[in-house]
Amino acid sequence: MGKQVTCRRVYEQTSFEDGKRVLVDRVWPPDISRDDARLDEWLGDVAPSTGLQHWYSHEPFRFAEFRRRYLAELADPEHRSALSRLRHLTDDGKLILLTAAPDADHSHAAVLAERLTGADRSEPDRPAPPPPPGYRAAVSAKVANLNAGAFAFVMGTGIVSTALNINGAHTASLALLVVGLAGCAVLLPAYVWRLLRWRQRFVADLVGPRAFAFLTVSIAANVIAARLVADGDTAVAGAFLAFGAAGWLLLGYGIPLGLIASTRRDASFDQVNGTWFLWAVGSQSVAVAAAGLARLTSSHLLQVLALVCWGIGLMQYLLTATIVLARLLARPVAPGNLMTSSWICMGAAAISVLAGTRLLELPPEGMLLSRSVVAGSAVVLWSFSTWLIPLLLALGVWRHVLRKVPFRYELGWWNLVFPIGMYGVTTHELGRTTGTSWLTTLGRWEIWVGGVVCVVVIAAMVAAAVRPHLMARRAAGSNRRTA
């Protein structure tokens, strides 16, 4: 009887016919508890290196090269103990290798199964690189693995566009606005395509701890609306606000309900992260856009909406901060898991300040709160967001310098652009509204910092997109010379 080794996603339904169930991922998979996983063992040491996983990114057209590199890694002595244990389990009977990868058949678990069953008996010393995929296949793979928070790109470009417009850099501001609108035009159909074509993956993200990242869709629409208000485009801004407010209402209730009602969630704090602050950012983004539009249209309804959303956002910020702080203090934080999303904590406070300054610009007769209450709250929140910046920078030094987590472009970098850009806008507008000149000056300098960060992240994004194609061409040329 031959060896029975198969690979499977850890989220799939378990069966009494399963043999030994072994998780072969380096980190615990999100959205599933240890009881639901029904593991016999967890051998994370046998997983690919972090660098190889980042390079692969579950792109099917890279699988052949990924397989070759991973097999080479498995030959290292550090994997010897874990491989020996897997071989022992294989000899005992049926073995199920579990992974959280979106496609188990094109994951390291499949390569491990091949290695354990002896299927990979021969492989060339220098295999030819896989041919580049067709355009349709490449786009399909990107959409299948689309990050739930992809609209963070639009949030970042939108707020920096607003910031540069304040500083008088109108051409650069318009260029970033166009980039943000183009991002909306590309990403929104991609979300719909993923929902229709890969519904299971989409729903898994929507009911898990990563669900708050979907609020970037609503926030991005409201950020664009606020930017268009500055140009006086009330009709288009109103359309973006309507879409953003509808998304905020749907997701603002749906995501917490999904988390509470889910039967597959982890009971620990492990899955709590900085993206949960997007719950508060969503409410404040509606407040900012609605208040700006109310000032131009004299709409009492929009003024009330802005005030109510501002109050809701403040309470959501306090609730989220409590949960995130409890998670940070109660559970150890791995350097690799301390993502740039931690900066959203500062961004959420900053956008709350901006919403407050926009409320202060509205007619006093429509205010349900004293203007001194709004102004005082804005100053307190600005002070807190300012205090957070050195702490976040120190955490970045701990992550990248002391714990040597490499700098690699990832979508999370846009979670850094948005808070920095928002802080610059907030500081300037708070100074202008309160007549504090030094705040206005500080805000102008912060805006330029946000612009530089945005340019750096765009350059890193383009480099990350181009690098695989350059590597494939270089490898192809090397193989032709060798032949």
What are these regions (language model features)?
Residues 1-123:
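Residues lining hydrophobic/aromatic ligand-binding pockets adjacent to catalytic sites
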Residues 156, 186-190, 327, 348-365, ...:
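C-terminal transmembrane-bundle signature of multipass membrane proteins
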